[in-house]
Structures are given as structure tokens and as C-alpha cells.
């Protein structure tokens, strides 16, 4: 295989138009499908909460635009407000560009010319979502650049919380 991981993709989210803000109408942001990548040793058929949460959150994110009359696109984040499962501290998702995929994998042009965008969702830590809120989605995406797009329950956070920083007091 070209990639040594599972690639899960929604099917049907793009059949429904999302409600995009007026300033984005006509920009082909109204249809999308979502992708999440799991490591090859992930127990993909397990229904246990510690393993099923990526599938659950793929579904949650896919249903969100229709249920909330909203839209999802690059840089949007959704928080769970608590860790997804007891085996990780990851607690939110960011909608990102497709990484580690061939050029053109991020779009599907339908026979009628309409476009369905494909976005990857990547799990985040609470402090990474807080960073986006206090800074910007562009800064968070830049900070996440280079992380493996495959879910890693224990990947290091890309943020260092102020309360966790260790400051030295200069000696006199």
C-alpha cells in the first residue's frame, strides 16, 4: 500500500449543501466530505470508547453542519470540552487541508461541475484550541505544520501552557 494507515472517509455529507456565510457563497465551500487517518494497529472494529471515538467524531463532525445550520471548512475547530477517551488527552478537532495525499485528492468535481471538498480532521488538545481562539486559525495551522496526520493518542501538544512553563529566577 502507498500508506501504512487506515483512511476513513465520510460518505453522504457532500450530498447536502452547508449553509455558508454570504461572503463565501459561490466559492465552492458548500459541499464537503471529511477524512481521518488511523494507525495500522488501531482496533478498527472495536466498539470500546477508547478506540471508537475517531469514528464517532467523524460522524459528529459530518452531521454538525446539517444539525446546526452551519458549515465546516479549513481552520474550523470543534471542542469536546473533555478528552475523547480515558486513553488520551485529545479533546477537539480541527478541519485541515488533506496532507500526505496525492495532489487533487482534496476535491471531487461532479458531472454537473459542482465541487465537493475533502478535508482532513485532526485531533487537538484543549490548549491548542485555546491557542486558536486567542491567536488565529492561521497561526494554529502553521504551528501544527509537520505533525503526522495519523491519529496519535500521545502526540506532544504543540502548545506550552503558561502555567506549565518553568521560569528561572536570576541569581544575584
Where are these regions (language model features)?
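Acidic, proline/glycine-rich low-complexity IDRs
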Residues: 1-21, 25-30, 34-172
Amino acid at each position: 500500500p502507498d500508506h501504512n494507515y487506515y483512511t476513513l472517509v465520510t460518505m453522504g455529507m457532500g450530498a447536502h449543501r452547508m449553509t455558508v456565510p454570504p461572503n463565501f457563497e459561490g466559492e465552492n465551500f458548500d459541499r464537503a466530505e471529511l477524512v481521518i487517518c488511523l494507525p495500522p494497529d488501531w482496533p478498527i472494529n472495536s466498539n470500546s470508547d477508547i478506540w471508537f471515538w475517531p469514528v464517532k467524531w467523524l460522524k459528529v463532525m459530518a452531521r454538525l453542519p446539517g444539525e446546526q445550520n452551519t458549515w465546516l471548512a479549513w481552520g474550523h475547530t470543534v471542542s469536546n470540552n473533555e478528552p475523547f477517551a480515558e486513553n488520551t488527552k485529545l479533546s477537539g478537532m480541527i478541519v485541515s487541508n488533506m496532507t500526505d495525499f496525492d495532489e487533487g485528492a482534496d476535491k471531487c468535481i461532479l458531472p454537473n461541475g459542482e465541487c465537493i471538498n475533502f478535508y482532513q480532521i485532526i485531533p487537538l488538545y484543549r490548549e491548542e484550541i485555546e491557542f486558536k481562539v486567542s491567536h488565529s486559525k492561521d497561526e494554529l495551522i502553521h504551528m501544527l505544520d509537520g505533525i503526522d496526520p495519523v491519529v496519535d493518542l500521545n502526540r506532544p501538544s504543540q502548545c506550552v501552557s503558561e502555567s506549565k512553563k518553568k521560569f528561572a529566577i536570576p541569581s544575584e
